[in-house]
Amino acid sequence: MAPSHAWFDEVAVHWFTQYQLHLQLQEAVSYAHTQGVVLKGDIPIGVNRNSVDTWVAPELFHMDMQAGAPPDMFAVKGQNWELPTYNWDVIESTDFDWWKKRFQQMSCYFDTFRIDHILGFFRIWQIPMEQEEGIMGYLNPSVPLYVDEFESRGVWFDYERFTKPYITDHILWENFGEEADWVRQNCLYLEHGFAYRLKSEYLSQKAVKKLYEDGKISERVKWGLFDLISNVLLFEVPDSHGRQYYPRYGMEALSTFQALDESQKRVFRELSVEYFYRRQDAFWYQSGMRKLPALKRASNMLICGED
C-alpha cells in the first residue's frame, strides 16, 4: 500500500503496533527457551468474518456461509459461530499458501501448537448465511442423499412435502398460542388451497430476526417462526437441480417426521443414519489427508489437534 493511499495512516499504525508486539514476543520466547521452557500456541479453525484475511483474500472463503456445530446435549439448536467457511478448492490450488504462512509465522513464537477443531480440516458444519441456528446446517464436504435412493426404497419423492416447512393448525397453536391467528393472517398463505406456506419476508431466520429487532414481531413469534422454518426433512444441495439433498439433523424429533407414514419414517431413518454415520468416513479421510500432511511440512512445530 502506497503512502499516498487514503487508508495508509490507518493501516500503517497497525503495522507498527504488530511489529512491536512481534519483537516483544520474540524476546520473551528467547528468554523462555534459555530457561528450558517449551511454548505451545493455539490456532482456531476459523477466522473472523471482518478480519484482515477475509478483506485481503475473500476468494479463500465462502463468505455466504457460516461455520458452526450440530445440536448436542449442551446446545439443542446447534451452534452458529458466524465464521466464514473455507473455499478449500481455491486454497488447494495455491498449494495451501495462506495456511502455510500462518503456520510458519506461528513457528516464530511456538515450539508446538494446538489446532482447535481439527475436524474442520476433514469436514465442517456449514450454515447458509440467511439462517441463524446451527440446526439449519449440514456437513461440508459430504456425500449427499440422492432422489434415487428414496425411490429405490419405495418412497415417491415429494419435493414440497420433504423440503418445505410442515405447518398445520395444531403446530401453529403449539408454537404461538394466542398469537397463532396473527401469524396465520400475516406470515402465511395457502398454497393449492390447503398447504400453509411462509410468505417471502418470513422464509429465513435472519429475516425474522431483523423483524424482531425492528419491533415488528414479538419474541414468541420470532422463536415460533424459527421453529417453523427448521421443521423440514431435507435441505436441497445448491446447484444440484433438485437431485441431491442433505438430511436435517435430528429429524425424528420433528412434527414433520412424525406426520410421515411408517414406511416413509423407516426410509428417512435409514438414509439419515447412512448419511451421518456411514458413507462419509473414507471421503472425509481423503479430504483431510489432502490438507494436513502438506501443512505439517510447513514448519517444524509439533502439531496437536482437538476435535
Label the model's feature ranges.
Residues M1-D307:
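Catalytic cores of glycan-processing enzymes that make or break glycosidic bonds
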